[in-house]
Amino acid sequence: KKEGYLVGNDGCKYGCFTRPAQYCESECSLRKGTGGYCYAWLACYCYNMPDWVPTWNSAKNRCGK
């Protein structure tokens, strides 16, 4: 199990600034996580997700590239 920021197919974090309050928690649950929240109103952070779920990594960041 791991935690971290959800990323999309483009390698960018899931934004949540304009999303409903439960958006991140729902997205994390869809990926078998046990919860999550919108960190600083910018990106979804999830807890206890399976290792196969892609999460943001500064060393492997490819957002916008």
UniProtKB/Swiss-Prot annotation:
GO BP terms: defense response to other organism; envenomation resulting in negative regulation of voltage-gated sodium channel activity in another organism
InterPro entries the UniProt entry points to: LCN-type_CS_alpha_beta_dom, Scorpion_toxin-like, Scorpion_toxin-like_sf, Scorpion_toxinL, Scorpion_toxinL/defensin
Tissue note: Expressed by the venom gland.
Keyword Secreted included in the entry's annotation: yes
Ligase is among the record's keywords: no
Cellular component aspect of the GO annotation: extracellular region
Record key words, sorted: Disulfide bond, Ion channel impairing toxin, Neurotoxin, Secreted, Toxin, Voltage-gated sodium channel impairing toxin
Subcellular location field: Secreted
PROSITE patterns reported for this sequence: LCN_CSAB (PS51863)
Record-annotated LCN-type CS-alpha/beta domain positions: 2-64
Disulfide-bonded cysteines: 12-63, 16-38, 24-44, 28-46
CDD domains: neurotoxins_LC_scorpion
One GO MF term attached to the UniProt entry: toxin activity
Domain text: Has the structural arrangement of an alpha-helix connected to antiparallel beta-sheets by disulfide bonds (CS-alpha/beta).
Function recorded in the entry: Beta toxins bind voltage-independently at site-4 of sodium channels (Nav) and shift the voltage of activation toward more negative potentials thereby affecting sodium channel activation and promoting spontaneous and repetitive firing. This toxin acts on human Nav1.4/SCN4A and Nav1.6/SCN8A voltage-gated sodium channels.
Family statement drawn from the similarity comment of this UniProt entry: Belongs to the long (4 C-C) scorpion toxin superfamily. Sodium channel inhibitor family.
Name recorded for this polypeptide: Beta-mammal toxin Tma1
Protein's organism: Tityus macrochirus
Native organism taxonomy: Eukaryota, Metazoa, Ecdysozoa, Arthropoda, Chelicerata
